[in-house]
Amino acid sequence: MPNPNHDDSPIQNPMNRFFNLLFLLTTATTTAFAQADIQKKIQTDLIMADDGATIDLPAGTFVLASSLSLQDKKNITIRGAGADKTVLSFKNQSEGAEGLRVTNGQNIVIENLTIQDTKGDCIKTMNVNGITFRNVKVEWTGKPNQTNGSYGLYPVQCQNVTIESCTAVGASDAGIYVGQSKQIVVRNSVAYHNVAGIEIENSIGADVYDNHAYENTGGILVFDLPDLVQKKGGNVRVYNNLIENNNFDNFAPKGNIVAQVPAGTGVVVLATNQVEIFSNRIINNKSQGTAIISYFMTEEPIKDSLYYPYPSQISIHDNIYSRQLVPATYKGRMGMMYRFKLRFGKNVPDIIWDGIVDEKAPAAQSPICLKNNKNAQFANIDAGNNFKAISRDISKVTCELPPLATK
């Protein structure tokens, strides 16, 4: 028997479907306009902000189509409702590369928000004196892929940089990257599923401490590279960090310098001067707990006449090392080196030095000094002589350098 409360007519059901579809289309259109409105409002606030202003972003997930920018401002705070509450998604980005770009500023604070899935870098700041990232998450939400943006947090050519209580996930170069900058603090932050978790490059005066770098290709990198505006970095301290299980396959695009970092890397110092690595726990990084290498290991040509390609005054002390008895990676160029030249098998040393030295430097002082590193095995791999005289004698590099000055 037909239900008197239910209209089964052939006309009514199609009409219901029509109105339902119309409702959905209207809702979607309204949502799209709302997202466009929030993009316009945020960008307008960034443009119109007076020096000293705070720009508050509401809670919610907002899908933005183009980059946001702030320039030529002083004493500005950009504040979300919380890293898990204010989410700016650039998944369908059609204009620009960065999520947020800040240039030519002074005393800028970015805090309590998340930026996701940008075409390029999540947040880039350039020529800013006094930049603070606090409780910020930057991430690519899909599987790690070389099409992900290069950098999560990316201050470059900045001074007085503070990165604290931040999280970086999925960068195809470095999750937290500080380049060509001066006076830097990176602390209480987390980086995982990046090629490099944290990278300090061509920068002067950096403290990297109380961070957790795990499940990256390489945990913490301290690099000096040629052909950059700021030629020589140094005075970098890496301490009180947990650097563990950085065995993630390298997914950097070919040609990037970090594409050469082997999976299973805890810390790498490349051609940098005055680096102190101490009081860290460097655990289960299968290829190299800590590596100290010259730029010659990259086999890239050096065209910059002012570039110094050797590491020097590298102090590694009072760290705790531990690793499982597993082979190093056999992938990539470095993997081939492990397999056919070094042949460590499962007994991979925790600390590896390429052994390439500047013949013009004073012979009396080793460029690296190791002391009081618990459970640490060492190898000088004699890379400059085609690995002919690999030595695991740690006594030749057991020495002490003066502590670097605190900031």
Task: Report each predicted region and the residues it spans.
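Parallel beta-helix/beta-solenoid
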Residues: 50, 72-74, 83, 104-105, ...
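Acidic Gly/Asp/Thr-rich repetitive segments characteristic of extracellular carbohydrate-active
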Residues: 33-58
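Extracellular beta-strand/beta-solenoid scaffold signature
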Residues: 42-43, 65, 91-101, 117-124, ...
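Right-handed parallel beta-helix/beta-spiral solenoid domain characteristic of secreted/periplasmic
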Residues: 35-40, 72-119, 142
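Sec-dependent signal peptide recognition
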Residues: 16-24
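Long, ordered, amphipathic alpha-helical scaffolds
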Residues: 259-263, 294-397
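Short, T/G/N/S-enriched strand-turn elements that build extracellular solenoid repeat scaffolds
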Residues: 42-48, 63-72, 78, 89, ...
